[in-house]
């Protein structure tokens, strides 16, 4: 029953649960696939960035004389580390370079040489290993978007009169939308870009089916009759299917050109649907028409009556008329000529330049319509249009079904990589435009690729995406769970998605295809409910952007437990019968139950085991990470589970975190996949440990050493008190000792809401569910003083305060501790740069960073100048611009940093010159050493072998085929980094070793070059700071927050409350053995909320604490009541936790037994210290002259309409008058009142409130003449 899994007793009954996929794959893998930096350039797939380049290149000028081709792209290492970017407020980015080839095809320019150049295209934000981007010093996440998949969708709507209207909409990846829809008169129209409508038959004519005959033949609706008098007589009484047209040509002379032009003319002899009679037959015979079309007499014609109706509405008779009609509809102008008119339809739907269905769109259309058009054909075809219309007609005749747009086969995920591809596409298209313009201008001069390219174009598009796009969000970094959840979030909002206002109930609702893909529980409360969701624990996004979830195959009632589970998309799952993961089966996987409850689409049939197609892989497959962390979730109401999973993300990391006694077994995976902790990279031994770093010596094979440039030892620096986005702190401490052996993946440290490698968001507390003197009424919480005293819920929060030193018109600002008109006491903790010392205690109003700024004033008189020169009075021309602590700030200075640009004077320039030459010499030695090391290692591998022809990336042979390797020959190679083609030796294994060695050499060389560039930059420029800023001073202040009355706490089951009273330890209710409880919760919070999971957790937690064990109870597969009872009996704990308590104040026993146990509580980010606020003298609004509102503005409390009524009701007229005048917006009155209070005089009469003047001005603005008269 219970298996021991990493020191937690696991209650899971399901066997063979597969390992979870990496929780950050959705971000990290998507970005890797986009950049493809790990892949060799000739092996890169046609996706991501490579594909975007291929779509935009080659670029030619208008005369096709010059061609700019794309060969490859690569990036240089970033200039700063991630942490340095955060401190300096910079973007963590890499310079993107492309290798471009420019050549000339014009024979006149034969002197123009082909040029291959590496061109800088701009810096591109780069993803950190934990799936975030650092933009302007803040960590951001690009959230994946859930949007309508490209393809064709069939839907229906109802007209006001009750008629059903049907439509088919083709949504491309890029290009115009086209929609086919019926109206109440049973006519089918095509709408292009939701604008102009035209009969479908007009579109048919425009794409090549020009006559009525061609159109009717598509649907097999007419029979053709040869015209002869005798032949037609037997068809009298039948209906005409197409017009009978008399066609002739007229010639006339074009006055402008003098050419003879022929024009086709049509005359309608008989219209459609005419019933033939004798007269008609004669007319037809006389008109010299060769054949006519009659309606067929079989049944399916009725289905297609819509086509006849549409032909009746069609104003055109030929292809030429049709394209001209379409041109007029779309452009609202006459077409200049037939060619232009024809081009418009081709451009809209049949040209790669303007229209693209994408691979997904083509796949969906083929799948829906049963076509087998090749995937490369990503524009619409005639066949597509015809098949769509045929399907729509089947739909009208109830022979087909409409699509469910909320089905996950019709919605796909746009991951980071795809969103970036789109932005790069926009940037490169703009760049291509400027390149073309520049090529056209430079006709005969010699120019290079660098001259054509403006690097700002691409950077500006990418930077605006990261800075302003709705899906690039400031990362929620309260704790590791919040980070990981934010990265796995899917949003239906954003550009190209829905908007909150327009989204109805259906889109927000849970759909049966969400099972295992999107979590039905975790979504925000409020206006975004259902629009923002979370990926299921096992879910993956496939290559086309559809979400897949794994299942085990079942054949004849036997579950395949050995193979890798099969991932199915929502579409592949349609119609399958899927059983639950915890059905009864023997060890071979044979299902032993007689009947099985299965899932089939939205239904739950009870079936025979042999009919089952698949089973789930795990019971928690349905939920997201947050929901899977709630033990006994199966006993909680879904609404409360939603609150529980959302509140776990707000839990503040505590000083001493503690993993829960009752967990679900997912805690370890969340901690390791959040990438916050340091994991061992292989097996090895701990060489050195202290609070700041861990050094490990790894065991490596000779083969690994042969291709590596790294030493066996690796040192990891631990993060100490780093500020997160939300102001909580990350502080890691080691959990290994010197001499310990470690294995791959082992966690080496803890901290930041983790303990011993497991997620630890809160603390286990002894709880009693009972009322306590009314203090826990309405979800309030009573807590013991011991909890506060022992720092159980104490957290450390870090704030950073920064001050910029700018260059002003009146002179430079300056950081200093010599501040005018400030006492020595106030500056005692400041250093010579005006920065407060580390370790100083800070109170509101203290100076954190001292700064003086030049002050503009009238020119001093000569006498003043003289006196100033003698007495050196500096105070006159500068003013205090220091940064002071805000009103509620109490803390300790944790760290300070000063960044400055390099100052340029003559002496400094000379020093820089020397420093640079020393630096280059130093690095030259390092480069030579690295190459020597490479040649030695390389020679060891290829010694005695002959070359198979090694080439560089331009295809030039560097090491000729058949030559025997010598050390001298290898030394002669100048550039190893570009030897990418050909074979080194005959056998593959050695080739792989050589390629790995050169790959590692490239990485090392890149790092060295990056380090050199960076050192040079530091010497020449100093610290990189935003424009106009000379220095940047930063001070980090740590605040220690103990638990207080007013703080919000919560359990994991949505049971939240506010601390109402902190009671002395001895006054808390105590158990029979004298142990006081830590926290008292109100039992009335449980029944109506229906989150009984907290009671199960409480009881099992107490038993676990007594036995010194921890448990894992996975959701939907957790401990049963019988199992819990067995454990409580073993632990000597009363069943259900029912026990009598004693009053701490009197020592008397309470009348009734209460539920007692151990519950896991979290302290949430809503702390009273951040919310408490009182205004003294503060700012006023400029127009209304009333005090501002809100803590951030140091504002007051609004005295609103209802409060005025209250004072009126009490007749408190003077109080009311003061509130509405001198305490608010009577400007003169408030100044006089202050004076009167200071001098101890009687209060003056109030004046006119400013809001009255505002009203007057508004009325005057309406043109009313308003005067105040005494």
From Swiss-Prot:
Gene Ontology BP terms: DNA-templated transcription
Cellular compartments per GO CC: DNA-directed RNA polymerase complex
GO molecular function per UniProt: DNA binding; DNA-directed RNA polymerase activity; ribonucleoside binding
EC number: 2.7.7.6
Record keywords: DNA-directed RNA polymerase, Nucleotidyltransferase, Transcription, Transferase
InterPro entries named among the record's database cross-references: DNA-dir_RNA_pol_bsu_external_1, DNA-dir_RNA_pol_su2, DNA-dir_RNAP_su2_dom, DNA-dir_RNAP_su2_hyb_sf, RNA_pol_bsu_bac, RNA_pol_bsu_CS, RNA_pol_bsu_protrusion, RNA_pol_Rpb2_2
Lineage: superkingdom: Bacteria
Catalytic activity, reaction form: RNA(n) + a ribonucleoside 5'-triphosphate = RNA(n+1) + diphosphate
Alphabetized Pfam families for the sequence: RNA_pol_Rpb2_1, RNA_pol_Rpb2_2, RNA_pol_Rpb2_3, RNA_pol_Rpb2_45, RNA_pol_Rpb2_6, RNA_pol_Rpb2_7
EC class name: transferase
Function: DNA-dependent RNA polymerase catalyzes the transcription of DNA into RNA using the four ribonucleoside triphosphates as substrates.
Complexes and interactors: The RNAP catalytic core consists of 2 alpha, 1 beta, 1 beta' and 1 omega subunit. When a sigma factor is associated with the core the holoenzyme is formed, which can initiate transcription.
Family the UniProt entry places it in: Belongs to the RNA polymerase beta chain family.
Protein name: DNA-directed RNA polymerase subunit beta
């Amino acid at each position: 029953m219970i298996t021991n899994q990493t020191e937690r007793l696991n209650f899971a009954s399901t066997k063979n649960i597969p390992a979870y996929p990496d929780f950050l794959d959705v971000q990290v893998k998507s970005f890797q696939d986009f950049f493809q930096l790990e892949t060799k350039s000739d092996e890169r797939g046609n996706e991501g960035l490579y594909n975007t380049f291929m779509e935009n290149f080659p670029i030619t000028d208008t005369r096709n004389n010059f061609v700019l081709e794309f060969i490859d792209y690569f990036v240089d290492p970033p200039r700063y580390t991630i942490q340095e970017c955060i401190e300096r407020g910079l973007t963590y980015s890499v310079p993107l370079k492309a290798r471009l080839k420019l050549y000339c095809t014009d024979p006149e320019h034969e002197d123009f040489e082909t040029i291959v150049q590496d061109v800088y295209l701009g810096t591109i934000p780069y993803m950190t290993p934990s799936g975030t981007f650092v933009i302007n010093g803040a960590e951001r996440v690009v959230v994946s978007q859930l949007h309508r998949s490209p393809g064709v969708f069939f839907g229906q709507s109802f007209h006001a009169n009750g008629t059903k209207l049907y439509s088919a909409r083709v949504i491309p990846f890029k290009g115009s939308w086209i929609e086919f829809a019926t109206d109440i008169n049973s006519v089918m129209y095509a709408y292009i870009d939701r604008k102009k409508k035209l009969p479908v038959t007009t579109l048919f004519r425009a794409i090549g089916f020009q006559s009525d005959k061609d159109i009717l033949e598509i649907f097999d609706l007419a029979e053709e009759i040869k015209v002869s008098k005798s032949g037609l007589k037997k068809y009298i009484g039948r209906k005409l299917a197409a017009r009978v047209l008399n066609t002739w040509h007229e010639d006339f002379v074009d006055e402008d050109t003098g050419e003879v032009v022929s024009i086709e003319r049509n005359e309608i002899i008989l219209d459609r649907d005419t019933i033939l009679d004798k007269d008609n037959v004669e007319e037809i015979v006389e008109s010299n028409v060769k054949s006519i079309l009659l309606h067929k007499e079989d049944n399916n014609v009725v289905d297609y009556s819509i086509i006849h109706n549409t032909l009746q509405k069609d104003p055109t008779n030929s292809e030429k008329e049709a394209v001209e009609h379409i041109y007029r509809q779309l452009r609202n102008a006459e077409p200049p000529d037939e060619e232009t008119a024809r081009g418009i339809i081709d451009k809209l739907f049949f040209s790669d330049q303007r229209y693209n269905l994408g691979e997904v769109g083509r796949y969906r259309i083929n799948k829906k319509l049963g076509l087998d058009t090749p995937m490369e054909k990503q524009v619409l075809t005639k066949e597509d249009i015809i098949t769509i219309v045929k399907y729509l007609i089947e739909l009208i005749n109830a022979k087909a079904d409409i699509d469910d747009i909320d089905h996950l086969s019709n919605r796909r995920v746009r991951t980071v990589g795809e969103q970036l591809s789109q932005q790069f596409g926009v940037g490169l298209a703009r760049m291509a435009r400027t390149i073309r313009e520049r090529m056209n201008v430079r006709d005969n001069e010699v120019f290079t690729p660098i001259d054509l390219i403006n690097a700002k174009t691409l950077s500006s598009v990418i930077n605006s995406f990261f800075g302003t796009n709705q899906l690039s969000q400031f990362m929620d970094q309260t704790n590791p769970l919040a980070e990981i959840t934010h990265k796995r979030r899917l949003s239906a909002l954003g550009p190209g998605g829905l908007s909150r206002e327009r989204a109805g109930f259906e889109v927000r609702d849970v759909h049966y295809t969400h099972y295992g893909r999107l979590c039905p529980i975790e979504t925000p409360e409020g206006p975004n409910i259902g629009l923002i969701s979370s990926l299921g624990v096992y879910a993956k996004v496939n290559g086309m952007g559809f979400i897949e979830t794994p299942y085990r195959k079942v054949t004849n009632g036997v579950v395949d437990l050995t193979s890798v589970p099969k991932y199915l998309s929502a579409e592949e799952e349609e119609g399958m019968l899927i059983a639950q993961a915890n059905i009864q089966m023997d060890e071979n996987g044979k299902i032993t139950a007689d009947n099985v409850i299965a899932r089939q689409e939205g239904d739950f049939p009870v079936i025979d085991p042999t009919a089952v197609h698949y089973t789930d892989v795990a019971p928690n497959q349905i939920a997201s990470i947050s929901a899977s962390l709630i033990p006994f979730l199966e006993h909680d109401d879904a609404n409360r589970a939603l609150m529980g999973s959302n509140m776990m993300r707000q839990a503040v990391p505590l000083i001493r975190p503690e993993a829960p006694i009752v967990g679900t077994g997912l805690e370890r995976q969340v901690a390791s996949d959040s990438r916050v902790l340091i994991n061992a990279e292989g097996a090895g031994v701990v060489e050195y440990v202290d609070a700041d770093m861990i050094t490990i010596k790894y065991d490596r094979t000779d083969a690994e050493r042969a291709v590596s440039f790294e030493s066996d030892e690796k040192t990891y620096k631990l993060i100490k008190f780093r500020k997160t986005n939300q102001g909580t702190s990350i502080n890691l401490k080691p959990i290994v000792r010197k001499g310990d052996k470690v294995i791959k993946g082992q966690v080496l440290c803890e901290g930041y809401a983790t303990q011993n490698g497991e997620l630890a968001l809160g603390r286990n507390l002894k709880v009693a569910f009972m009322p306590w003197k009314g203090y826990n009424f309405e979800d309030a919480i009573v807590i013991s003083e011991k909890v506060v005293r022992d720092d159980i819920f104490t957290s450390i929060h870090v704030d950073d305060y920064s001050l910029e030193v700018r260059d002003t018109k009146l002179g430079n600002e300056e950081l200093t501790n010599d501040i005018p008109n400030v006492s020595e006491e106030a500056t005692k903790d400041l250093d010579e740069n005006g920065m407060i010392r580390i370790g100083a205690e800070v109170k509101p109003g203290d100076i954190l960073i001292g700064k003086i700024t030049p002050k503009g004033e009238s020119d001093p008189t000569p006498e003043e100048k003289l006196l100033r020169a003698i007495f050196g009075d500096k105070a006159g021309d500068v003013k205090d611009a220091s940064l002071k602590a805000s009103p509620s700030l109490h803390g300790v200075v944790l760290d300070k940093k000063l960044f400055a640009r390099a100052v340029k004077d003559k002496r400094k320039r000379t020093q820089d010159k020397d420093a640079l030459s020393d630096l280059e010499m130093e690095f030259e030695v390092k480069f030579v050493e690295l190459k020597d090391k490479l040649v030695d290692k390389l020679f060891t591998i290829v010694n005695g072998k002959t070359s198979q022809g090694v080439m560089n990336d331009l295809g030039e042979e560097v090491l000729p085929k058949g030559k025997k390797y010598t050390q001298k020959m290898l030394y002669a190679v100048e550039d190893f980094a570009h030897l990418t083609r050909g074979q080194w030796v005959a056998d593959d294994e050695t080739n792989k070793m050589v390629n790995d060695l050169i790959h590692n050499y490239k990485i090392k060389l890149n790092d060295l070059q990056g380090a050199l560039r960076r050192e040079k930059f530091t010497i020449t420029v100093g610290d990189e700071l935003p424009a106009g800023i000379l220095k940047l001073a930063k001070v980090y202040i740590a605040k220690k927050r103990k638990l207080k009355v007013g703080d919000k706490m919560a359990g994991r089951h949505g049971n939240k409350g506010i601390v109402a009273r902190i009671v002395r330890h001895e006054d808390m209710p105590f158990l029979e053995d004298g142990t006081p409880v830590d926290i008292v919760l109100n039992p009335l919070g449980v029944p109506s909320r229906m989150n009984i999971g907290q009671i199960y957790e409480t009881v099992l937690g107490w038993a676990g604490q007594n036995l010194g064990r921890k448990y894992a109870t996975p959701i939907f597969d957790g401990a049963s009541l019988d199992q819990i009872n067995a454990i409580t009996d073993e632990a000597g704990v009363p069943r259900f936790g029912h026990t009598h308590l004693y009053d701490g104040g009197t020592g008397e026993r309470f009348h009734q037994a209460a539920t007692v146990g151990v519950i896991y509580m979290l302290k949430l980010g809503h702390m009273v210290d951040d919310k408490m606020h009182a205004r003294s003298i503060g700012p006023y609004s400029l127009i209304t002259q009333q005090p501002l509102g809100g803590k951030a503005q140091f504002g007051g409390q609004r005295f609103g309409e209802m409060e005025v009524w209250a004072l009126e009701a009490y007749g408190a007229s003077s109080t009311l008058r003061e509130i509405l005048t001198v305490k608010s917006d009577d400007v003169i009155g408030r100044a006089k009142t202050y004076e009167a209070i200071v001098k101890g005089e009687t209060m003056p009469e109030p004046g006119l409130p400013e809001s009255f003047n505002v009203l007057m001005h508004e009325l005057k603005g309406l043109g009313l003449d308003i005067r105040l008269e005494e």
